[in-house]
């Protein structure tokens, strides 16, 4: 039992539209809609200028691949599958979207699970920018995604089994340490 509060207010008391404006999410399964890349990035920020959209994409490390597309930001993508974009490119567009939204709270749920190592590195750099100076919840199985976190909660069977920084958890020699060294070898 308990409650989740934002600035001391129980979220059950906050209107749903206000919550949506204050929480940005990048999920494992990225959703894009039919339209241009520009429109997909600007979703949720109807008054976004081209400069704001490009700046968000640059912060998300997406501008490079977008600029190389024949129509750049005006490239039309056809569906949730992203119309020919790789999983990593779709994730970078989703990250660009939440960069533009600039919400005080971020939820990143397995956002690197479907990408290759090189794309993961690019997404990691984007996450560093995205999570700077804001409350962020990062749900991850890839420990590289969370190593720089201020606090890591290790879950086991629905309960918090361990908590601490990366270094503290390695020193404890528990579940996190076992996972880390098994992935490292």
Regions found by a protein language model. Name each.
Residues 2-9, 19:
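Conserved ABC transporter NBD signature motif
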Residues 11, 20-29, 37-40, 54-60, ...:
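ABC-family ATPase nucleotide-binding domain "signature/switch" substructure
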Residues 34:
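The conserved phosphate-sensing helix
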Residues 42-50:
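ABC-type ATPase nucleotide-binding domains, specifically the catalytic core motifs of the NBD
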Residues 63-70, 176:
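Conserved H-loop
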Residues 171-185:
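C-terminal boundary and immediately downstream tail of ABC-type ATPase nucleotide-binding domains
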């Amino acid at each position: 039992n308990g409650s989740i509060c934002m600035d001391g207010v129980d979220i059950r008391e906050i209107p749903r539209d206000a919550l949506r404006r204050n929480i940005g999410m990048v999920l494992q399964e990225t959703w894009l809609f039919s339209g241009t890349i520009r429109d997909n990035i600007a979703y949720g920020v109807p008054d976004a200028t081209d400069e704001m959209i490009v700046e968000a994409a640059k912060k998300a490390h997406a501008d490079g691949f977008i600029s190389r597309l024949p129509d750049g930001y005006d490239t039309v993508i056809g569906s949730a599958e992203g119309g020919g974009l790789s999983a990593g490119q779709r994730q970078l567009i989703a990250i660009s979207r939440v960069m533009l939204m600039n919400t005080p709270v971020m939820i990143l749920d397995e956002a690197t699970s479907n990408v290759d190592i090189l794309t993961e590195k690019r997404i990691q750099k984007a996450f560093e920018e995205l999570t700077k100076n804001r409350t962020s919840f990062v749900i991850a199985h890839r420990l590289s995604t969370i190593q720089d976190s201020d606090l890591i909660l290790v879950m086991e069977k629905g309960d918090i089994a361990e908590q601490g920084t990366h270094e503290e958890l390695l020193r404890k020699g528990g579940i996190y340490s076992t996972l880390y060294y098994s992935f490292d070898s």
